[in-house]
Each structure stands twice: as C-alpha cells, then as structure tokens.
Amino acid sequence: MFERDIYTIHSTYREDMHIKGFQFGKGEKSACIVGAARGNEIQQMYICSQLVKTLRELENNGCISAGKQILVIPTINAYSVNISRRFFGVKEADINRSFPGNDYGEPADRLTNALLTEIKDYVYGIQFTSFYRPGEFVPHVRMMETGYQNTSLANLFGLPYVVVRKPVPIDTKTLNYNWQDEMTAAFSVYTNQNSQIDEASARQADPVREPFRLYQSCII
C-alpha cells in the first residue's frame, strides 16, 4: 500500500486540507473508489476505510494482480467532515455538484478540477455517495444515462436494483457524469445511512467483500 497526497488546499487560518489516496498495486489504472464528498457522509467514509483494510490484506497476501492499480480516496472534503457540515466552505458549495471544475475558480472548483485530472484515466470508477435530498434508501447503484453507462456491469454489484437517470443540467456537474464523459465506467453506490454507520449495509456495499465481478480484473 502506498499513501499519497492527491491535492492540498492551503489555508491561512486553519490547517491545510490534504486529500489522501491509498494506492494498491502498480501499472494500469484499473479501479478508483471515492468516498465522502459531503461532510455528513460518515457511512461512505467508513466503507472506504474497511475497503482499504481489506485491500491491504489482499496485497500483503499477493492477491493484487500484477500490472493493475487500485486507488481508494476515503474523503475529498475533510474540512466539512471535521465541523459536521454537509457542504464545503463559507459559500456552502456542494462538491458533488462542482465538477469538472477549473484551475482558476473558487476553492471547490479547483479541488474538483485537480481530483478529476487525477482519477479520469481509471477504467472503473466507484463513488460512495448520498442523495441530494433527505430520504431512506435501499442500497442500490445509480448512474447517469450518457451513452456510456453499462447496466450489465452495475448488476454485478449484487445490490437489489440499478437506477439509470436521464441527466438534467445540474447533473452534468456530478462526478458520475464527468467520469463517464472521460470514458470511465462509473457507478454511484447508495446505502441506507449517511451520518451514522450501518454495518450491514456497509458490508453489502463493499465491492470487495461482496461479489463485484469487476474486481476480477484486479484481484486474484
């Protein structure tokens, strides 16, 4: 396992925010998993922490295929997690509505631009996320209808159902949409909790513990 900084936001009045990634294996960029983009996505961050633990054990046992790389980013919004606020910064920006961003914009735009530049070349992209409205959810996979979506692959998560959504203009600012626009097979995974941990749904959503066949390209 190799821990590296994906992007750093410098601050005058508080500690810098480092977006950290955990890389397993070397070679082709096979799969990238992104966790909490909003400050209340504790469940999503927890799933990524368990995923890092599992992948580290697999790597130590020589079970990561040669020439394959997996990257896990547990959170891209540690500032909001630390102060228990859903959105980012004084302008309350929704990170998952700020893609693809740009290098000369607001902090949220610079963050998403740097992140997408780092992760856009992966074959598979998985985002653990929450819906933009409050509600109760059965764990499921959701993706945008861009012409690049692949519901057959989404079914391999083994979750109860897959939702394909026709994007409206605001959806074009999401990570899922922009990942697909970069030709990454992107999947958004929803569980039934956000701000607290639910072990059962966390295990159900974990793509290594559960029979997600895409990982056969990365893991023996």
Q: What are the language-model segments listed below?
A:
Residues 1-220:
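Structured catalytic-domain cores with a bias toward divalent-metal coordination
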